[in-house]
Amino acid sequence: MEWEFNSYYTLIAATLVLLVGKFLVKKIKLLRDFNIPEPVAGGLIAAIILFVLHQLYGVSFKFEKPLQDAFMLIFFTSIGLSADFSRLKAGGLPLVIFTAVVGAFIIVQNFVGVGLATALGLDPLIGLITGSITLTGGHGTAGAWGPDFEAKYGLVGATGLGMASATFGLVFGGLIGGPVARRLINKMGRKPVENTKQDQDDNADDVFEQAKRTRLITAESAVETLAMFAACLAFAEIMDGFDKEYLFDLPKFVWCLFGGVVIRNILTAAFKVNMFDRAIDVFGNASLSLFLAMALLNLKLWELTGLAGPVTVILAVQTVVMVLYATFVTYVFMGRDYDAAVLAAGHCGFGLGATPTAVANMQSITHTFGPSHKAFLIVPMVGAFFVDLINAAILTGFVNFFKG
């Protein structure tokens, strides 16, 4: 029996997940020590409860997926609207280095997936599905490549396997990022910081770095900000249809990001509009939390248990590889400092899961140890935009090599 939740009940369920997550993180020291994001903590509890209900009583729940997608698009729009070109210039060489590090990891991820799949007697394409298609690419990329593999190469169940693998990555990307960064930070001897009210006021315009900071916004600024969000979403809808017909078939969230960047910089440069970053920050962080909560509510653990043993082995090895790469490559190449540790947490997030997971990982660290402007400048831009272009190019090369 399946119970369907409409958008209202889905929103209620997501907020309950967030409240449970907040309570758990507040009460359980282990979750705080490992910097587990509140949506991940609450979402996993919800997923386990839904799994038990399914196994014992055959009950499943269907939550409103378009609402989850909408919050994801709003989150990426907020990243674009926060991307002032004058700030992006500050990315400089670290932005280039991090992009190269991420690109190299995509290649490593696919070699690990294909190598293990071949060794275990599976189709190499399954290695790509348990590689960067689902782990770096996420659910959107899995949904795009899965039907293609089924239609062109007869790989039965590719889409379902892709969805399950992407879900695995989303969960573990949120679980490993905090512990990896915390271990690196502890080694350098950095201590947790006290976030005083004065600190919060001084840093009020730093977007996404501390989701729990109090921000003062007005009804007027909220309406103006909502108008910009609506314009970006409309732009993304138009470009998504045009893109599928004539261009590269990029995910819609890329167009949300791009639209936000364009609108932000045209308004500030050409019309001298004073952007109200605090309102953008509030909408972006709220959307991020709700997206993650809904994604985990839609997690069907019984589908993960249905994964073949070899596929589970591949995904487990990929998780270990991500931890090692973030620790010994990402952290080292980005400078072996606090910013590098936060970047490593972010890389774990979108290297296995998605950019929202990366941001949640970094927020859990900066809330404890203080801000990292560099990480919050670089990770959203690379994770939301550059990584999809690089991943598409690398995947095309791998597929052509094995099936060309």
Whereabouts are the PLM-identified features?
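Entry/N-cap segments of selected transmembrane alpha helices
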Residues: 84-114, 226, 282, 297-327
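Flexible hinge motifs at transmembrane-helix junctions and intramembrane kinks/re-entrant loops
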Residues: 24-40, 57, 61-64, 183, ...
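Hydrophobic transmembrane alpha-helices of secondary-active transporters
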Residues: 17, 44-52, 64-92, 258-267, ...
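Juxtamembrane and boundary regions of transmembrane helices in multi-pass small-molecule transporters
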Residues: 115-122, 166-206, 320, 325-338, ...
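C-terminal ends of transmembrane helices
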Residues: 20-32, 78-90, 180, 263-277, ...
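Structural signature of hydrophobic alpha-helical transmembrane segments
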Residues: 2-16, 62-75, 125-132, 247-259, ...
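Alpha-helical membrane segments and immediately flanking helix-loop junctions
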Residues: 116-161, 168, 180, 197-199, ...
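Intrinsically disordered, low-complexity non-transmembrane regions of multi-pass membrane transporters
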Residues: 1-5, 11, 18-20, 182-226, ...
